[in-house]
Amino acid sequence: MMIVKSWQEKNFEPCFALLRQLVEHFPVYYANGNHENRMKYHENSFPGWYKEFVAELKKLNITHLIDESIKLENGIRISAIDLDESYYGKFKNHKATISPEEIREKVTIDDQTEEFHIVLCHKPLNTDGFAKNRIDLVLSGHYHGGMIRLPKIGAVFSPELSVFPKYSGGLYRENNTTLISSRGLGNHTINLRFLNKPEIVFCKLVKEKDNEPIV
């Protein structure tokens, strides 16, 4: 999550107001998106913004993951994939897929374990790359639900201004991999939502065999 008023005036407070409430009740794991990386790689335009933002995450004891994996109790692994700016160009000037090999370069894949693997990837990408790496759950967002949604058609625009994005919001499955794309809370590029309610996704993980909650 990243909230700013504009690229000339930063205002992190709405974001951290929510995060402060979340950390009171849950462990929070944070992955970068396109806004964070824009601050990170364009220091001249946003001097000190990224360092300030990351420092605030640390103050709240939020686990900030960048192309890394951590193993939790109960056989759960959480990983985060950090996508570079080539994935976020406007119109057709952006990558829309990620290969199984690229995924393995960014996160730990253990083919010999039965652990449940959750991957945070800001932009929802092709599910086959994750499925081939036996990743169980991918949590994404970025598309803001397509901003404008039409009956029987679905999402109209992506933030890259391409039309009819595939993974615009909801649940998608390929083999044993599930991808959830949240419609999120804010707007992007076109400051408009039409037939597209903001949302926070709540996931309950349940063991397949004995129907007991994992977390």
Model feature map: region roles:
Residues 1-3, 27-34, 65-67, 118-121, ...:
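Active-site neighborhood of phospho(di)ester-bond hydrolases with catalytic His/Asp-centered motifs
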Residues 1-63:
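Membrane-embedded segments
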Residues 3-10, 37-51, 86-96, 152-164, ...:
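Acidic/histidine-rich helix-loop elements
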Residues 34, 80-82, 183, 207:
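A mature extracytoplasmic/lumenal domain signature
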Residues 64, 78-80, 179:
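Generic preference for hydrophobic
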Residues 124-202, 209-211:
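Conserved beta-sheet core of the metallophosphoesterase superfamily
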